[in-house]
Amino acid sequence: MPYRSAVLAWSLMAQMMGNANWLLTDEGELRQFGSADIESPPQVYRLYHFLTDLDAALEKFEDDVSRVEAIVPLVRKLLVSSYWLQMEYDPPSPKTGWAVKFLYREYQYPLTVQMVTWQPGTPSTIHNHGTWGIVALLGGQERNRFWRRAAEPKHPYNIESTGELLLNPGDVIGFTSDAIHAIESIGDETTVSFNLYGITNYDRRYKFHPESRTAEKF
């Protein structure tokens, strides 16, 4: 695959100027936090190490912002150390334009750990996740557009644009539960990302239709 070589450069890209950790809040505000620089650990930081540390972080912190800020360094540590993860993905489906490969599945395990690919030019719906989330870009370029709720008496699901951000390999973005965004793979390369999500509240997860100022659960 022509895009497989792109993900191998992630650990180097993460050290370069310009890469960053981003956080999108429920209010549609985007801010940078922490450092994108991380050294390879002296011993291999395996997936089970990451999952153990992830459980500890979730037990320690209860709010979305604190959880994202605590977990992003763990994600960077994992991706720098366990190179095999950067190759564990499926090519996008010709029908949908995207593909998902789960990295860890266990009976009643509540979190989602997966690799996601999008073919160039494929957009997502405008949506929130109903839980906190973290996306680390490994290959390609991904445009993120952001919104916030702007409820009106007759249109409780009205939203308004708050900006956009272009993610490059080495960038990581986190979301709070009601942060609203849409993504699109741009350029010539398939977008490859490591995605991590908390426990989804399906009663709070929506895709939005700004033209009609409506939304629906999904």
PLM-predicted stretches and their roles:
Residues 91-120:
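A short glycine-rich, His/Asp/Glu-containing loop-to-beta-strand
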Residues 2-83:
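N-terminal leader/capping segments at the start of a protein or of a new domain
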Residues 114-128, 176-178:
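Conserved short histidine dyad/triad with adjacent acidic residue
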Residues 150-178:
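Short acidic-glycine-tyrosine-enriched beta hairpin
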Residues 131-143:
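Glycine- and acidic-residue-biased ligand/ion/polar-headgroup-sensing regions
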Residues 134-136, 182, 188-204:
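A short hydrophobic beta-strand segment most commonly corresponding to one strand
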Residues 123-124, 140-146:
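Short beta-strand segments in beta-sandwich/barrel cores
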Residues 119, 138, 166-168:
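Residue-level recognition of short, solvent-exposed, well-ordered loop/turn junctions
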